[in-house]
Amino acid sequence: QSNPDLKAFYCANDTMALGVYEAVVNAGKQDQVMVVGTDAIANAKESVKNGEMAATVGQDNVGIGVACCELAVKAVKDGWKADPSAEMPVEYIDSFLVTKDNVDDYL
């Protein structure tokens, strides 16, 4: 209500996005406001398939798990500790966009 010209929401996770979409519907603006989430959970993919949410961004969850385990092993085995003042290592993890055009590939 305080931002009537709002065109889109990008949410940090799909649970938030599904709630935002519900609020958008309750405001009667589902044809005017785009909602995109993150995580590609089953309910969000169904929402995308049904033309409700515009998209969801999924990640390589196995890759995230492997990277976390490797860091944990390094911490235990080598005594590695994060130095808050040092530049932290970056691990890039693949992501993918699920839209109405490709949602069936991810269901």
Language-model regions: role of each:
Residues N50-V62:
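Short beta-strand elements at the ligand-binding edges of bilobed clamshell
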Residues Q1-E46:
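Hydrophobic alpha-helical
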Residues G63, A67-L107:
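Hinge/cleft segment of the Venus flytrap/periplasmic-binding protein
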Residues D14, Q59-V62, V66:
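Electropositive phosphate-/nucleotide-binding environments in soluble metabolic enzymes
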Residues S2, A23-A27, S47, G51, ...:
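Structured segments of extracytoplasmic/periplasmic soluble domains
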Residues D39, D60, D101:
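Residues at the C-termini of beta-strands that transition into short coil/loop
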Residues D5, Q32, E52-M53, D94:
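A generic structural signal for alpha->beta connector loops
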